[in-house]
């Protein structure tokens, strides 16, 4: 009986958040270990299905770094990271697109549909969803930055009760393909849609200070200082830059969460304290 009462209390405590977030748009960047571990995969898709069930409009943008690394290693194709971004030559770009659009995207979409959600898998190439240009004059190879997001397509899918699952591959006006950093892709989509929240699932507890303690809230000034002293570095830089860009462009809050924690998405959104780092404008 006591356990049942506790369950009821948890549900009731989430009610204000459910009411607040109904019909709001959430963009979730899905990557890291949560994409590899079968238990975490199932937790994630059920969390997304629940968000849809309680009336949230959800867009999922996925990465695929671990699986891309695996395929590149198997094919003996070298790959390196510069400034937290994967340098992508033409040969690697073919593998990146195959893994993101053909493998991971369809797996996530199928799992969501299996668990009661209504999801549709798309690439940034579909219906000119994402138009890009080459980043930094080709410093990173076939890595692009998004210039335009086709919000008509995304809003149409959301209004019809679908969850767009977006593979971060885009083209330019000459139909050249580009690898888009998934964090920056999620940021651009969230900004274009004026989303309520954007959530980045990572393999850390959030943003940590030099002593390894979680920083629960940050603003631009704090972020600048932490980047200058090296606290924020490596692969966390594009995540933080992506989060900051969102809140500058009208997204209410950005969240960086530990995707290794079961149901971290629900804990962050539907509890008073949250469990990650929230970035505010």
Curated annotation (Swiss-Prot):
Domain of life: Bacteria
Pathway it works in: Amino-acid biosynthesis; L-arginine biosynthesis; N(2)-acetyl-L-ornithine from L-glutamate: step 2/4
GO biological process, any: L-arginine biosynthetic process
EC number from the UniProt entry: 2.7.2.8
Function: Catalyzes the ATP-dependent phosphorylation of N-acetyl-L-glutamate.
Site (Transition state stabilizer): 29, 239
Family, similarity comment: Belongs to the acetylglutamate kinase family. ArgB subfamily.
Database matches in Pfam families: AA_kinase
Reaction catalyzed: N-acetyl-L-glutamate + ATP = N-acetyl-L-glutamyl 5-phosphate + ADP
Organism: Campylobacter curvus (strain 525.92)
Protein name: Acetylglutamate kinase
Subcellular location: Cytoplasm
Record has Ribosomal protein as a keyword: no
UniProt xrefs under InterPro entries: AceGlu_kinase-like_sf, AcgluKinase_fam, ArgB, Asp/Glu/Uridylate_kinase, Glu/AcGlu_kinase, NAGK-C
């Amino acid at each position: 009986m006591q356990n049942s009462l506790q369950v009821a209390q948890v549900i009731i405590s989430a009610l204000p958040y459910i009411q607040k977030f109904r019909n709001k748009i959430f963009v979730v960047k899905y990557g890291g270990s949560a994409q590899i571990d079968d238990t975490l995969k199932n937790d994630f898709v059920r969390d997304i299905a629940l968000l849809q069930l309680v009336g949230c409009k959800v867009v999922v943008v996925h990465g695929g770094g671990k699986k891309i690394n695996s395929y590149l290693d198997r094919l003996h194709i070298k790959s390196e990271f510069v400034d937290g971004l994967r340098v992508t030559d033409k040969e690697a770009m073919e593998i990146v697109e195959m893994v993101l659009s053909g493998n991971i995207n369809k797996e996530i979409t199928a799992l969501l549909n299996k668990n009661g959600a209504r999801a549709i898998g798309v690439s940034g190439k579909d219906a000119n969803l994402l138009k890009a240009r080459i980043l930094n004059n080709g410093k990173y190879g076939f890595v692009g930055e998004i210039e335009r997001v086709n919000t008509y397509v995304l809003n149409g899918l959301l209004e019809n009760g679908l969850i767009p699952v977006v593979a971060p591959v885009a083209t330019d006006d000459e139909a050249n393909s580009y690898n888009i950093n998934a964090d920056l892709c999620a940021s651009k989509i969230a900004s274009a849609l004026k989303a309520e929240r954007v959530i980045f699932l990572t393999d850390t507890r959030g943003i940590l200070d030099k002593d390894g303690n979680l920083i629960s809230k940050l603003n631009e000034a704090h972020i600048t200082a932490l980047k200058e002293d090296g606290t924020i570095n490596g692969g966390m830089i594009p995540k933080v830059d992506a989060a900051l860009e969102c809140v500058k462009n009208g997204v209410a809050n950005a969240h960086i969460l530990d995707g290794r924690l079961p149901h971290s998405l629900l804990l962050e959104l539907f509890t008073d304290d949250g469990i990650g780092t929230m970035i505010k404008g």
